[in-house]
């Protein structure tokens, strides 16, 4: 494919690379709810108290600390499939095995075992994310970042919806054990995407020792960005802080506060969620290049925060099927758009030689709202109620939006090389 052809919008969207990015996004999204919303609903059905459920958000801490072992994925190249795809395959095989083991656990009689298995799923899933994120950072050209990020997020969200819709309906008809087994099968099928992905060339300057694999990514990041590195890290932590906190408890809100059945939750997610993800992915891929990254981040960020007020209305008014459908639809549209722009910025901030570690650092920080401070959400709900919780999470978006103004243009919108531009 020539650079000119690849530079045209139509050819970018229709390329095999975008299809693979979407498929790998699906692989990344599949395990997430198994340690998040679906697990929370399983614990809710097992009569586990709200504070314990909120504490279970901590099983996802590997997503927050994955930067600690990401240097190993930059340093070591598996003997098969290459530096990026090799690690994808290893983690995907591991995920299939641990998810099957999770299916045999019982949270009501052995909560501790469920927690350990959930941590294992999160660790393998986080490592898979490191490999896939590095693959995207290495493979996507500058002009492909917006579309590639949108394709990845679209696949990611579709996977989450598959688990959170069909999965919940299946749980109502059968059991959560069947849901986990079914997810393991889908995870096994995702291995096909790993074989179809192109393996990026290993840079000559990649780390040759563990020491350099650990030190170089951080030193290079701060040297290249200067003072803006601190703003970039704060932005990564705060842009989606409130949304991450909502993510950890919204399933319990539907189930316990609104007294919705698993089938109802699954049906609404299927109808409103799939439509929202599709529209959000299209809008993100189309609007981000036209608006520019900074304006896209601001617009999408405001939309993300605003959707939480629909949950405030639900908490105050009680169950309304119209409002539930509207909240889920708008939430998925806004969050898909925000996440796509967010990830495109992360790619722009990384150096391909050490992309696994640098991207992992940024995405690790982006999950602190749920993984590190998830327990705060449980305390707010227990002490002040759901309406206060959702209102507070909307306000938590403000610091991240302010930081968007301070991100240097050279960081979030690097110039496209003339020969790579489309006509």
Segments predicted by a language model, with ranges:
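C-terminal transmembrane helical hairpin of 12-TM major facilitator-type secondary transporters
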Residues: 295-342
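Helix-to-loop junctions at the C-terminal end of transmembrane segments
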Residues: 65-82, 279-296, 381-382
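Juxtamembrane intracellular "pre-TM" segments in multi-pass secondary transporters
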Residues: 2-15, 199-231, 423
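Short amphipathic helix-loop junctions that connect adjacent transmembrane helices
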Residues: 31, 37-52, 239, 248-266
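Glycine-rich segments within core transmembrane alpha-helices of 12-TM secondary carriers
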Residues: 65-66, 146-171, 365-374
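C-terminal ends and interior cores of transmembrane alpha-helices
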Residues: 88-108, 302-319
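Symmetry-related core transmembrane helices of the 12-TM Major Facilitator Superfamily/SLC fold
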Residues: 90-97, 178-195, 388-406
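Intracellular juxtamembrane helix-capping segments at the cytosolic ends
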Residues: 126-140, 337-351
């Amino acid at each position: 494919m020539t650079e000119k052809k690849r530079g045209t919008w139509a050819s970018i969207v229709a390329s095999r690379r975008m299809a693979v990015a979407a498929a790998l996004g699906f692989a990344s999204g599949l395990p997430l709810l198994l340690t998040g919303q679906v697990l929370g609903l399983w614990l809710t059905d097992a009569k586990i108290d709200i504070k314990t459920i909120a504490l279970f958000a901590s099983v996802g801490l590997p997503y927050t600390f994955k930067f600690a072992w990401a240097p190993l994925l930059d340093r070591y190249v598996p003997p098969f499939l290459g530096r990026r795809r090799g690690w994808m395959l290893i983690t995907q095989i591991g995920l299939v095995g641990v998810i099957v083991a999770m299916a045999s656990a019982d949270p009501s009689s052995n909560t501790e075992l469920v927690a350990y298995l959930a941590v294992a799923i999160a660790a393998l899933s986080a490592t898979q994310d490191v490999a896939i994120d590095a693959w995207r950072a290495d493979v996507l050209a500058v002009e492909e970042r917006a579309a590639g990020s949108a394709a990845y997020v679209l696949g990611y969200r579709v996977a989450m919806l598959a688990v959170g819709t069909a999965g919940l309906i299946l749980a109502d008809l059968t059991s959560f054990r069947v849901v986990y087994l079914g997810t393991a099968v889908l995870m096994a099928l995702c291995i096909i995407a790993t074989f179809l992905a192109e393996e990026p060339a290993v840079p000559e300057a990649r780390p040759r020792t563990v020491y350099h694999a650990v030190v170089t990514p951080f030193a290079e990041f701060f040297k290249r960005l200067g003072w803006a590195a601190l703003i970039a890290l704060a932005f990564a932590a705060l842009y989606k802080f409130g949304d991450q906190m909502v993510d950890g408890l919204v399933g319990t809100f539907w189930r316990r506060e609104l007294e919705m059945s698993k089938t109802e939750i699954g049906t609404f997610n299927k109808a409103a969620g799939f439509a929202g993800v599709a529209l959000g992915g299209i809008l993100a891929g189309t609007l981000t290049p036209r608006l520019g990254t900074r304006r896209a981040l601001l617009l999408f960020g405001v939309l993300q925060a605003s959707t939480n007020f629909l949950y405030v209305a639900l908490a105050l008014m009680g169950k309304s099927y119209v409002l539930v459908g509207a909240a889920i639809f708008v939430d998925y549209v806004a969050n898909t758009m925000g996440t796509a722009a967010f990830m495109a910025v992360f790619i722009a901030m990384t150096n391909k030689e050490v992309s696994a570690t640098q991207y992992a650092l940024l995405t690790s920080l982006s999950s602190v709202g749920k993984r590190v401070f998830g327990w705060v959400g449980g305390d707010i709900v227990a002490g002040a109620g759901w309406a206060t919780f959702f209102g507070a999470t909307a306000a938590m978006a403000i610091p991240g939006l302010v930081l968007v103004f301070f991100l240097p243009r050279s960081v979030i919108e690097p110039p496209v090389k003339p020969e790579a531009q489309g006509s």
